[in-house]
């Protein structure tokens, strides 16, 4: 089998994770920490790309990586327009939306830009894979009870789809042939209904929908939320933080550290026990609801993300959902590996690269 060498780039707010892979095998994985003062010199996140590019090239050189031997560069997908899942070739339309922050400004927007800037000089392809804006929801799943307020698909697409493919391999099937319920449990929690390779419904794990998590409130009583918003006691930003960042375990027990909470549970703390069980209860409830989306025809339930390392949490969830389908646990997440595998599927011609095309306010994927 021929070897494809792939450079993978995953930019964060103050760091850039890079990896070099020979097919699926990691040759180099490193987290480049950026000086906060250096980052602070740039007014816009997008202005950092040249600085980060040079830093990446310096690190590769220091490890003896000959970039002329690369076959492709793959970056973390940013805040683009809603698109279906898959591996996309970085093109001019995508670069424009990333640079202009069409759906928001975030460090992940640099992923596609950095991939393109490095790849174009080497005359090799640049890709992104399954960005957070992946949207494959069916029309019926978008409807809410208020006109003009559609449900949105915002979830851990990269890890959910990567783990779903691994489980499909373990079951000796193609991802596109299975119905899976995949639950990513980290700072936020999302439960995706994967129908034959498409995530046809998923809770919005960012903006207050689904189970509460270490840092996010999830679904809350809306009437009480409205009363709180108009009580005159809180600014808008404070309310947003109650939903994202200071919600969930942070609000209920004062920490986002699930390990600490689990230690409290093991010591018999009644409040911690109730709250931790409540989080598992809400995850199980979301899984149960998602099973109805797939008419109860489920090949497997998958638990992944950092919280899937918690035996207490996993056992509580299993106890409530094992009757629906077998529960498979893949703890943690490996975004660099997932990005490399997405690029590799295209290089091996196992799937065609998709094209990001903007037409009259909408984006279509062609591939």
Curated annotation (Swiss-Prot):
From the UniProt record, which GO molecular function terms apply? Answer: acetate kinase activity; ATP binding; butyrate kinase activity
InterPro entries in the record: Aliphatic_acid_kin_short-chain, Aliphatic_acid_kinase_CS, ATPase_NBD, Butyrate_kin
**Gene3D superfamilies in the record, alphabetically?**
3.30.420.40
Localization annotation: Cytoplasm
Q: Does the keyword Transcription apply?
A: no
- Among its keywords, does the record have Nucleotide-binding? yes
**EC top class, as a word:** transferase
**Reactions catalysed according to its record:** butanoate + ATP = butanoyl phosphate + ADP
Query: What's a Pfam family this protein contains?
Result: Acetate_kinase
Give the main location.
cytoplasm
Protein EC:
2.7.2.7
Coiled-coil residues are: none
Q: Name one GO biological process term.
A: acetate metabolic process
Q: Which UniProt keywords apply?
A: ATP-binding, Cytoplasm, Kinase, Nucleotide-binding, Transferase
GO CC terms in record: cytoplasm
Domain of life according to the entry = Bacteria
Q: Which family does it belong to?
A: Belongs to the acetokinase family.
UniProt cross-references to PANTHER family, sorted A to Z: ACETATE KINASE, BUTYRATE KINASE 2-RELATED
Name under which the protein is recorded: Probable butyrate kinase
> What is the organism field in this record?
Bacillus mycoides (strain KBAB4) (Bacillus weihenstephanensis)
Gene symbol here is buk
């Amino acid at each position: 089998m021929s070897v494809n060498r792939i450079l993978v780039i995953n930019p964060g707010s103050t760091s850039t994770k890079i990896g070099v892979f020979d097919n699926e095998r990691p040759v180099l994985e490193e987290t480049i920490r950026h000086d906060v003062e250096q980052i602070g010199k740039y007014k816009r996140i997008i202005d950092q790309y040249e600085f980060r590019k040079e830093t990446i090239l310096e690190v590769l050189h220091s490890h003896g990586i000959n970039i002329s031997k690369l076959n492709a560069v793959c970056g973390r997908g940013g805040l683009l327009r809603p698109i279906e899942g898959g591996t996309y070739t970085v093109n001019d339309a995508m670069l424009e939306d990333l640079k202009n922050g069409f759906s928001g400004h975030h460090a992940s927007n640099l992923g596609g830009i950095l991939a393109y800037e490095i790849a174009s000089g080497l005359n090799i392809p640049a890709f992104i894979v399954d960005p957070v804006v992946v949207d494959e929801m069916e029309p019926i799943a978008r409807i809410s009870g208020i006109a003009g307020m559609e449900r949105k698909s915002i979830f851990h697409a990269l890890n959910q789809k990567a783990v779903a493919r691994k489980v499909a391999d373990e079951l000796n099937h193609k991802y596109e042939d299975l119905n899976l319920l995949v639950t990513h449990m980290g700072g936020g929690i999302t439960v995706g209904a994967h129908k034959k390779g498409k995530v046809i419904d998923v809770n919005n794990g960012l903006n207050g929908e689904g189970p509460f998590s270490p840092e996010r409130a999830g679904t809350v009583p809306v009437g009480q939320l409205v009363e709180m918003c108009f009580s005159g006691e809180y600014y808008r930003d404070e309310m947003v933080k109650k939903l994202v960042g200071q919600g969930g375990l942070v609000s209920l027990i004062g920490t986002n550290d699930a390990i600490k909470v689990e230690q409290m549970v093991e010591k018999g703390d009644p409040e911690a026990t109730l709250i931790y069980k409540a989080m598992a209860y809400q995850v199980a409830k979301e899984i149960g609801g998602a099973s109805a989306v797939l008419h109860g025809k489920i090949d497997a339930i998958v638990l992944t993300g950092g919280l899937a390392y918690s035996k207490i949490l996993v056992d509580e969830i299993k106890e409530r959902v094992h009757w629906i389908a077998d529960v498979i646990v893949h703890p943690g997440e490996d975004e660099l590996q997932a990005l490399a595998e997405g690029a590799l599927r295209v290089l091996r011609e196992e799937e065609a690269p998709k094209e990001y095309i903007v037409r009259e306010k909408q984006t279509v994927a062609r591939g």
